[in-house]
């Protein structure tokens, strides 16, 4: 651990949460000398809210982080205690891997992963300010104790710490999370630098003592019999798998909440900022969905040897006494004890439209932001941004250009494009529905989509690269074998495979596209196929199922990339474009899109404005002196 008064690094990352660890590890994997600055190294990898990783859309992000050799997938596999594949009955494109995680195991595994990352130094301290040289260029950090860290790039991953304020009923407690001081000086620095700041809110439920819950009458949710790991490097899940309980709120609970709404800061005027739409407080649920008989609550154990229960579904900021009365009106919780009250927390965030596609602040080269500071919510969203910001910080420190990810290749690209193009008015979370190319962006092909890119960018290590090459070779061999065998309808019939009597010969791959034909059916015809590992067989089935649809989607992707190829100069003077209305100029200047495609995704930008931009871009491309955009889409 660093103890000197000053030191020189290539990259300094502020914050040891889910964004910070991925940013620091990614920068270090890219060869940058990296510092991870955190108040308390013992809190690295802490799960501040729910004890779970993954889910719908979120599981895709974890797989993509893993494909780029990030940490979250491997750590979740090491700490997972209830693996479930969500949306199992739906198509492969929208299935989402998820696991409950043992909090202590998760933090311990993450801290081990950080400690084992070459080139990464953990620095205990609080970042109070940014340092700039005589020319106004960012050159380091100033810590609260007076130490300075000189560096070539900074990544801020401050979570809920920027002027964080906890609310419990009428009480207000300045804090980044329970028991930890907020980052006030750093928020003032960002304000002084002229960045557009806003205020958001999130919340968490009370923690319950599982030993005081009556589990006997509750529905129990089992883990999957065969856990699906997040990381392609994980051979098997070794932790015991646990069950979660399910209960519901009642009319009595709703009546109590309504009677005390005036004491909730969201309804008393104590909090004016917006919370996450898809993770509302129990107060919001009762107000917005007043006709419902009850709301489901998942009672999630926080560890294998920890009696603490996370009641997923009743986030609240009501006074502690009301919280106690509230939970004791819920079936199974009549005698429950609260270990820690729920609370809401407000915090500052930076308008993500200040950023480019590499998560660098446009007006402050070398400063990168990731996680809740960009207006997102969720561990997985934070981890994905952290990885992208970290690898780009390393590139900036090394004199290289920004590397962006586009919407057609990853959910990382979808998320970042949404943030920097649309901005946020409430905490942003990922869903598969946000992607227009989700048939291509599946959890099962994240490595095929992104690992080659990661190898080219230098953030994928040799072990993963070798494992990926072996996996791709196995997929290629399986596909070649399927393409080499075929059957006519009359040949298929004796094997119990029913096809239209059209006389057409179909390859093994084409046969696999039929919903009723599985790998076992083909192996009964060609026995050597039984030797193909299940993971490879499942991937072949998915590829065959989606083949026709992917051909159509690839045409859409080609059109998308044509617009993305029309670059707009970063210093473009929109006032000089004749015919643009003042409204269009304001929208474009706020985002400063890098491509015509990104401009088209800005809310309210008209086709007429896009035509003017396209004409201007074509004229600029013909002019030898036209500035080039160094930020690829």
From Swiss-Prot:
Cofactor(s) needed by this chain: FAD
Q: What is its main location?
A: cytoplasm
Entry-linked InterPro entries: FAD/NAD-bd_sf, GIDA_C_N, MnmG, MnmG-rel, MnmG-rel_CS, MnmG_C, MnmG_C_subdom, MnmG_C_subdom_sf
Q: Hey, which family's this protein in?
A: Belongs to the MnmG family.
**Protein name as catalogued:** tRNA uridine 5-carboxymethylaminomethyl modification enzyme MnmG
Assembly with partners or alone = Homodimer. Heterotetramer of two MnmE and two MnmG subunits.
What organism does the UniProt record list as the source? Methylobacterium radiotolerans (strain ATCC 27329 / DSM 1819 / JCM 2831 / NBRC 15690 / NCIMB 10815 / 0-1)
Kindly list the positions annotated as binding FAD.
15-20
The answer on whether this UniProt entry bears the keyword Flavoprotein reads: yes
Q: What is the role of this chain?
A: NAD-binding protein involved in the addition of a carboxymethylaminomethyl (cmnm) group at the wobble position (U34) of certain tRNAs, forming tRNA-cmnm(5)s(2)U34.
Its keywords, alphabetically, are: Cytoplasm, FAD, Flavoprotein, NAD, tRNA processing
Gene Ontology, cellular component aspect: cytosol
> Which is one Pfam family of this protein?
GIDA_C_1st
